[in-house]
Amino acid sequence: MDNDSQYSGYSYKSGQSRSSRKHRDRRERHRSKSREGSRGDKSVTIQAPGEPLLDNESTRGEDRDDNWGETTTVVTGTSEHSISHDDITRITKDMEDSAKLDCSRHLGVVIAGALALLSFLTPIAFMLLPQILWREDLEQCGTACEGLFISVAFKLLILLLGSWALFFRRPKAFFPRVFVFRALLMVLVFLLVVSYWLFYGVRILESRDKNYQGIVQYAVSLVDALLFVHYLAVVLLELRQLQPQFTIKVVRSTDGASRFYNIGHLSIQRVAVWILENYYHDFPVYNPALLNLPKSILSKKMSGFKVYSLGEENNTNNSTGQSRAVIAAAARRRDNSHNEYYYEEAEHERRVRKRKARLVVAVEEAFTHIKRLQDEDPKNPREIMDPREAAQAIFASMARAMQKYLRTTKQQPYHTMESILQHLEFCITHDMTPKAFLERYLGPGPTIQYHKDRWLAKQWTLVSEEPVTNGLKDGVVFELKRQDFSLVVSTKKIPFFKLSEEFVDPKSHKFVMRLQSETSV
C-alpha cells in the first residue's frame, strides 16, 4: 500500500487486479509529466540589452560543475534591440512625468530669479531716478553722501554672492510640494520690496524730494534689510537642521537591510531626499537573486494521503489502523526544509570559499606578469603597453575564475566584462595591489559604485499619511517606493537627558593592603 501511495497519492483497498493498477499509475504519471512539461513551456525569459550574456540557468550555478560554460555558444539576433508594449507605455509615462517636472522646476527658478533681480536693482533705481527726473533741483551730495555709494556697492556685492551661494545651487531633487521656508522668504522679500517702492513713490517721487543724501540713505536701509533677510534664510534653511533632534530607521522592504541616522528639524519631503542621498552610499546594492531560497527546497511538494475503505463493514477497525499508520508516516516525513536549507547554505559557503581562493590566486599571478616601466630601464617598443593594453593582456588569465566566482555569488548582473576591464585599468594605472582590485568583487559594495543602469531610479514615490510639508514628529512613518522595492522610514525623537554632578576629591583615593598569612608580596 505504501508503494502504491507513492505513485498515486492514494491508497485503495479493492478487488482490482495489480496489472490494472500499474497501468493506471503509469498513465497518471505520464499525464502529470505532460502537464508539467506544458506548464514549463510557458516560461519566457527576456534579456535586456547591455546585460551579460548569461542565460537564466546561470543562476543555478550550484547544479553545474566547475567546467560548465567553457564551450557554451550564445547566439543573439535582432532580439537584442526588441522592445515590448509595456516598455513603450512605461517610457511614454516617464517622458510625460519628466516634462511636467521640468516645467514646474523651471517655473520656480524663473520666479525666484525675477524676484532676486527686482530686489537687487531696486536700491540702484532709488538712487538713479532722482538724477534722471529732477537732477537740477537736487542738493549737492557731500562727502558723507559719496561714502554711502561705496557702502551700497559693497553691500550689494556681498548680497549677490551670498544669494548665489544659498539659492542658486543646482537642485538635488524635485519636491512634490512647495518648500515652505523658501516660499515664506520669497514672500517676505516681495513684501519688503513692494513696501519700499510704495513709500518711495509717495514720499519721494510725488514730492520730488531735494535731499539726495536722504534718498541714498533710504536705499542703504533697503540693502541692510535685504542682508538681514539673507541672514534669516541662512538660519532657517541651513543652521536649523544641523542640531540632531530625531533618530530615523530606514529598512529596505525586500531583504531587510537597515541603517540608523540622526537628523534635525526637516520637512518629510526634505528628509526623503536626504535619505536617498545616504541610501546610495550606505546600503549595499539591491540584488534580487539573493532573496529566494534554493529551488531544490521551494520545488519540494509534500504528498497528500487519502484512505478509502471499499471493503466490508467488519474491516472497519483494520482500515482505521491502516489510515493512522499512513498519517503517522506522513508526519515522520513532514517538511524538513530547514535541514535542507542548512546544508544548502553550508555547501554554498564552501563553494564560495573555494572559488574565492581560486580567484585570489589567479589575480595574484596575473599581477605578477606586469610591472611599471622605469626611466632607467631599457625600452623595447614591442614590450611597452599602455594601461588598457596591459589590462587586456592579464585579464584573460583571471577571466575564468572571475566568471565562476561572480556566478556563484550571484553578482554577474552587476559586473560586465567592460566594467571589470575599466576597473583593472584603473588599478594598474595607480599602482594598486591585487587586494585593492578584488575589493570591489569580494563583497557587495555600496549602490553608487555600480553602473547607473543597474540601480538608478528616475523617480521615487513618497507615501505618507502626514502632509509632506510638515516637519518630522515622533512616530512618523513614511515610505519611499520604486518599482522593485521600497524604503520604510520610522522616526523616533531623541530623548531628553538630565545629568547631575557629583564631585570626588582626588585626595580621597587612598587604599590599605589586606595581608594574610599566605599573602606573598
Curated annotation (Swiss-Prot):
Compartments reported by the entry: Cell membrane
Keyword Transmembrane (UniProt): yes
Tissue localization of expression: During gastrulation, broadly expressed in the dorsal region in both mesodermal and neural tissues. From the neurula stages, expressed throughout the neural tube. In tailbud stages, expression declines in the anterior notochord but remains strong in the posterior notochord and in the neural tube. Also weakly expressed in the prenephritic region of late tailbud embryos.
Low complexity composition-biased segments: 1-18
Residue intervals annotated with topology Cytoplasmic: 1-108, 169-178, 240-521
Pfam families reported for this sequence: Strabismus
Keywords, ordered alphabetically: Cell membrane, Developmental protein, Gastrulation, Membrane, Transmembrane, Transmembrane helix, Wnt signaling pathway
Amino acid composition bias (Basic residues), ranges on this chain: 19-33
Family: Belongs to the Vang family.
Subunit (UniProt): Interacts with dvl/dsh. Interacts with prickle3.
Protein name (database record): Vang-like protein 2-B
